[in-house]
A protein has these predicted regions:
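Signal peptide processing junction and immediate N-terminal pro/mature segment
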Residues: 27-38
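Low-complexity, Ser/Thr/Pro/Gly-enriched N-terminal "stalk/linker" regions
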Residues: 38-91
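Short, low-complexity intrinsically disordered segments enriched in A/P/G/S/L with frequent Arg
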Residues: 2-11
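Extended ligand-binding groove/face enriched in aromatic
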Residues: 100, 109-225
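Bacterial N-terminal signal peptides
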Residues: 14-25
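Solvent-exposed loop and edge beta-strand segments that line ligand/cofactor-binding
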Residues: 42-48, 83-100, 140-156, 198-211, ...
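Long, repeat-rich segments with strong aromatic
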Residues: 223-373
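Well-ordered alpha-helical scaffold segments within catalytic/enzyme domains
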Residues: 39-46, 60, 100-116, 157-173, ...
């Protein structure tokens, strides 16, 4: 895979969808709602002060080896080694996937705030991790016996999102790190391309194994890398898993330890795959409970209230802060894909804002249970990383 961004391969399912969605089509009333571009971002723009706070969270844990939660298969006594020997590039931030997306956080913030005071330290941290020797060690670990499903799909998807962020940067250091990461990027992409056709059912939970969220991250990588095989595998997965879904039970969410919404993550993936008019029609059948209203009547998100966090020192209960952050960006992404005067926009944007308001003040690092990962979710939201046309 070269360094230059390639034109993404696309294949349309418009004809196919026209038949499957006709029963879900709803004539939109002739009422005027604000265009998505006229409504405020769910969290407001990411400013330098917030960027510095979030960068500090990643810098604190990127090479902090302990505590460490290993997802590690041992085949012999020789596999009982410390994390920095097992996965020498990504061994901090409690677990592999959090360390990977902590690297993504720093790469993105360097890209957005190249002159910020934290950038020097961030470059040093990234250079420490992303060396040819460390990446070779990561590949060797992945290829070890019993590790075919290691960090699949969540951590692997974040690895590709890190690769995409490096590919999209014109920074000289980022170009070098991209080249260094490329062998691991290829290894991960090949694993996922092989895995998706063998996955017969999507995983519809609210934690790491969820399929839809990972597919969205992988889709964005495929758009940057120009990987045609991956794009085809993702489009096939969208058709098999989600195209005919109806009436997603949003009222059953969240489960007590969710950090992803199964319903919203699916919609956030499908808005990437489908054309805007077809997505708007599909969404009517998939989430018919989204209110249709004017801006003045959509202020209270009673249809989707933010999740309640009872104990931020509990590593599982603290997931709900992440749920609120990811819901906010998914709602924003869904709104972004709808027509400018769609009457669902006010409700979607009001709910996105309410979730962001509930979660962002909690991204402080007071408790390592959330501090090792919530910064990434805050940056993904506030920098609008999942929206088309953003840097």
């Amino acid at each position: 895979m070269g360094d230059r961004i390639a034109r993404p391969h696309a294949r349309s399912y418009v004809t196919l969808l026209a038949g499957c969605c006709v029963t879900a089509a709803v004539a939109l009333p002739a009422r005027t709602a604000p265009a998505a571009s006229e409504l405020p971002a769910a969290a407001g723009p990411l400013d330098a002060a917030a960027a510095a706070r979030f960068a500090a969270l990643a810098l604190k844990c990127l090479h902090q080896e302990y505590p460490n939660h290993l997802s590690h298969t041992l085949s012999s006594d020789s596999d009982a080694r410390p994390p920095h020997e097992l996965t020498p590039a990504f061994y901090g931030c409690l677990d592999w996937h959090s360390d990977v997306h902590g690297h993504w956080l720093l790469v993105r913030l360097i890209r957005l705030f190249p002159d910020a005071p934290f950038v020097t330290e961030a470059r040093t941290a990234l250079a420490r991790s992303l060396t040819p020797q460390n990446i070779a060690g990561e590949i060797a670990y992945l290829r070890g016996a019993g590790r075919a499903s290691f960090e699949r799909p969540y951590g692997l998807a974040w690895l590709l999102r890190l690769a995409a962020e490096l590919r999209g940067s014109d920074d000289a250091d980022a170009r070098g790190w991209s080249a260094t990461l490329a062998p691991l990027e290829s290894e991960v992409a090949a694993r996922l391309t092989s895995y998706l056709p063998r996955l017969h059912y999507p995983v519809r939970i609210g934690e790491h194994d969820q399929t839809a969220f990972a597919l969205a991250l992988i889709w964005d990588w495929a758009a940057v890398s120009g990987d045609v095989r991956m794009r085809d595998a993702l489009q096939d997965a969208a058709q098999r898993f989600y195209l005919h879904d109806r009436n997603c039970p949003l009222a059953y969410e969240p489960s007590g330890e969710d950090f992803l919404s199964p319903c919203l993550a699916e919609a956030d993936f499908m808005r990437r795959v489908l054309s805007p008019p077809v997505f708007a029609q599909w969404l009517s059948g998939f989430l018919p409970q989204i209110p249709r209203s004017t801006a003045s009547t959509a202020a209270a998100p009673a249809w989707l209230p933010p999740g309640v966090v009872t104990d931020r020192a509990d590593p599982k209960l603290a997931h709900i802060d992440g749920l609120n952050l990811s819901r906010a960006w998914m709602l924003e992404g869904i709104a972004h894909a709808l027509p400018p005067h769609d009457p669902r926009l006010p409700a979607l944007n009001a709910a996105a804002q309410a979730h962001a308001d509930a979660a962002l003040p909690a991204v402080t690092g007071e408790h390592y249970e959330g501090g090792h990962w919530l910064g990434t979710f805050a940056v993904y939201l506030t920098s609008q990383a999942g929206l088309p046309g953003t840097r």
